[in-house]
Amino acid sequence: MSLNAERSYKMKLRDVENAFKYRRIPYPKRSVELIALLAISCTFFLFMHTNKLNSRLKEMEVKLQPSEFSALGLTGNHISGHDAGKHDDINTLHGTYQYLKSTGQKVGYNVHDRRSSEEQLRTPTAHGHHHDHHSHHHHMHQQEKIDGHKHKASHDKQLAVPDNKHKEDEVHYEDDEDEVEENDDDLANDVGTTDSEGFNFKADLLNNTKYAEVDFVFFNRVPKVGSQSLMELMARLGKINGFTHARNKGSAHETIVMNKQRQNDLIADLLTRPKPHIYSQHIAYINFTRFHLPKPIYINLIRDPIDRIISWHYYIRAPWYYRDMQAKLGENAIPMPSEEFMNLDLDTCVRNHDPHCTFTQMQIKNPVGDHRRQTLFFCGMNQKLCMPFNSEAAMQKAKRTVETEYAVVGTWEDTNITLSVLEAYIPRYFRNAKVAYYLGKDRLSRVNRNNVTRIVSDETRLILRKNLTNEIEFYEFCKQRLYLQYAALSHGKRFGEDDYLLVPEQQNEYNEDY
């Protein structure tokens, strides 16, 4: 083939190749329009569907916020009391969430941020009205002491609770000393973040046990909340978990508010006792660190304020109560009152404005000694702040103390939740608490129980409710905190069916030496 012929052949071959490579396949005009319309339709559908899905997710987020409580089976019946007049905002799960939000508890998982803010406020300059007796040198000394206890964090997470079995004596809130402290300093706590095995992050943030500086539990028990049963349980757990327990000496009258010297003497005595140990007494909250002494683990129990008043009214009108005091205290016991006093029912007492049943707002010393102030046991020893009855200021101070100082504040109204939280947050003392409780439930449920009681009318309950507004708010606050602690442990799920413990049948001989 000649050179020209070969070149012509190659050019034709290249033209064919280019024609094939850059070929254009014709489409009907209608097909192009359909494809464009389909693309636009798909884009619009995806946009609308995504927007609707986003709105639905936001709605579900709000509805599912309290899911940790619904997973626990906590409904309005668990949170509210018997009466119809209770706060509407916690009678539903969504209401519970809104209540927690309004009190700052739902964002309470940012406890480290809160504590950091409090630390800044508690410097000698910013907090001078609380620390006008402390120098900058002492502030640095206290910080060094707190830092020195950091290495105990994992051990301190395993501390806490009270003991013993004894009847509650009639008590008076009036202090038997002239001097009552006027300043009840807040405690500056170190912030720990170390988790131990079995703890999740949220539970750790709600656990104050790790801030304890000594292996000692202080149970400043509130009267008529079932503290005798808890002390009996502690007596049994002491044999299992290896700690000692004690309570104050019985007396005809209890001193709830003490002056500074008596507080110091009591603390010094308690800190010299062999450890680990627990101590219980009817006494208002004591701030150990204001005496430059190590902080213990604080625990307590609460009860519906209306039920407490009903319980107290009939407790001091039970003949066996005075016979028991006579047997224990002899000639120092209070004599049995008149028959008229013993037979006075609460409905009549409230209706006739008897001094025993008159609830004057902001009253500092009521005519008769009783236990109408549950907040006092958490507010502290500042008589001017904490003694006025149903005081909002006392209630707010009590809330703050519970949130920053107390490891656990439980209630027998939620037995399984309380025992579960105690076991998990203070295992050093409460390990096996549920087993011990259910094995001895018959005995524990009868400790100090008063069968001398009567039905109280709805009218009387309503009158009490109107006069105990801040006491009731504090009680509800403590229950919400307890539920949060439990929910944090369970990751929003049940531990078991209602967290009931299945205990195998046992012979009764354990009652003798358990």
From Swiss-Prot:
- What topology does the record note for this protein and the membrane? Single-pass type II membrane protein
Q: Which Pfam families match?
A: Sulfotransfer_2
Q: Locations of Basic residues compositional bias?
A: 127-140
Q: Which residues lie on this side of the membrane: Cytoplasmic?
A: 1-30
Enzyme type, top EC level: transferase
A cellular component term (GO) from this record? nucleus
Report the active site residues.
282
Note the SUPFAM superfamilies from the entry: P-loop containing nucleoside triphosphate hydrolases
UniProt-recorded Gene Ontology molecular function terms: endopeptidase activator activity; sulfotransferase activity
Q: How does it assemble?
A: Interacts with wbl/windbeutel; the interaction is direct and does not require pip to be folded.
Purpose: Sulfotransferase involved in dorsoventral axis patterning in early embryos. Required for the ventral activation of ea/easter by the protease snk in the perivitelline space between the embryonic membrane and the eggshell; activation of ea requires both activation of the ndl-gd-snk protease cascade and sulfation of a vitelline membrane component by pip.
Q: What is this protein called?
A: Uronyl 2-sulfotransferase homolog pip
Native organism is Drosophila melanogaster
Q: Which gene encodes it?
A: pip
